[in-house]
A protein has these predicted regions:
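Short catalytic/binding micro-motifs of nucleotide second-messenger systems
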Residues: 75-77
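Short S/T/G/P-rich N-terminal loop/turn motif that feeds into the first structured element of a domain
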Residues: 1-50, 57-71, 80-104
Length: 104
């Protein structure tokens, strides 16, 4: 399993709710149809910071998801809400455990 963490800084605080709604209603249904998709989380990390974590089967699929998300942000004209490119960390998951009871 491969994970991509994207840290977005400089988020327009007054539009965070709008962004989260668009991610949930528009991006996530499309992202979840990409090959190898395993999971996605959006995190309100700080006053002007949001992070996302996505999980895919392979490194190539995870890389494609990063391109897909960047394209989606442009399509949705969210450059004013998310003005900076994300700081990206990606790699293979080497240890993980869930209990299956997590709820957002």
């Amino acid at each position: 399993m491969h994970t991509t963490v994207r840290r977005y800084e400089g988020i327009d605080q007054s539009r965070k709710s709008e962004l989260a709604k668009k991610v949930g209603e528009n991006l996530l249904p499309r992202l979840s149809k990409l090959p190898g998709f395993s999971g996605y989380y959006l995190i309100d990390a700080d006053k002007d910071v949001m992070s996302s974590i996505s999980f895919f089967d392979t490194s190539a699929q995870a890389d494609e998801s990063t391109r897909f998300v960047a394209s989606w942000l442009r399509e949705e004209k969210l450059e004013n809400v998310v003005p900076n490119s994300p700081k990206i960390t990606d790699g293979e998951v080497i240890v993980h455990k869930t209990n299956g009871a997590f709820k957002a």
